[in-house]
Amino acid sequence: YESTVYPGCVEEDCVPLLEKFSKLNFNKDFFCGYSPERINPGDKKRTISSIKKVISGSTPEITNLVNNLYIQIISAGTFKASSIKVAEAAKIIENTQRDLNIALINELSIVFNKMNIDTEEVLEAAKTKWNFSPFMPGLVGGHCIGVDPYYLTYKSKKIGYSPKIIL
């Protein structure tokens, strides 16, 4: 699989369906590999081959098989996650963090505007600190970033936790 899904989706949702309809047994008759998509459509600098690829498999052997496939086309290299769930969670955190950071800057921009403070100037000043992560007010962008926090919230509620800041 190569998509953005919540942690557990491949093994808890997809695999049972594959087993049911194929009559095959997971990790005996068939295996799964997962690598979240990490492309940035339209970005000429960060192309598919120049972005390190997180890869995983349902067994160490499958992880190596998936790795051997991707290292042929990904010049930036790969990162072997210890499990499919870790790889799924890595992608969700990437997009959820971006969504939340832009939402925070949007809200701060509204506050600063009401105080007659130029947000761009504030950001330029804040960027002088080595560990400040700059984000600009605006739309989140991307086809999946805005929906990924909902995937994580869905899974969180299924395991009995209601997130406080994800949405």
Feature map (PLM): residue ranges:
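Structural/interface elements that position substrates and couple domains in central-metabolism enzymes
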Residues: Y1-L167
